[in-house]
Amino acid sequence: MKKLFIIGGTMGIGKSTVSQILKQKLPNSVFLDGDWCWDSSPFQVTTETKEMVMKNICAVLNNFLTCSAYENVIFCWVMHEQCIIDKIISCLNTANSRMIAVSLICSEQELTQRLQKDVRAGIRTSDVIERSVQRIPLYQKLNTIKVDTSGKSAAEVAEEIAAL
């Protein structure tokens, strides 16, 4: 039976890093970051682009799920509302798959420190800090397994998720 890991969390919490480590750790794994499905310049969030990104995500994930080469499908994206997770799941062919939905969480202080490091490195702009911190409480409301990343390395978090 395949495993489908759906990994959500606010911006800067470590979804992509953890997912990349998980991909290397688990056998026959493939990884999709939802951000890759609408990586554009300028980045535009409209009704049309939101519909497009969902179609792109579902198409790629379904291709991974039906490909016999893969045992572990790893998907990460911000997914701060249950309706986003539900919409993605509803369009997937999950027969013969076990779905593991995870939300990465951490303290406000730790998230701020991580994001400030990214801002200093030029990876993110400073406005992301406030937006990301404001979303932290939204993840507690989701029907997902919560994995607290506070004080843990990305490898430790990946190990915890792999054990689920």
Give the ranges of each region predicted by the language model:
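Hydrophobic anchor at the beta1->P-loop junction of P-loop NTPases
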Residues: 7
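Conserved substrate/cofactor phosphate-moiety recognition/catalytic segment
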Residues: 16-62
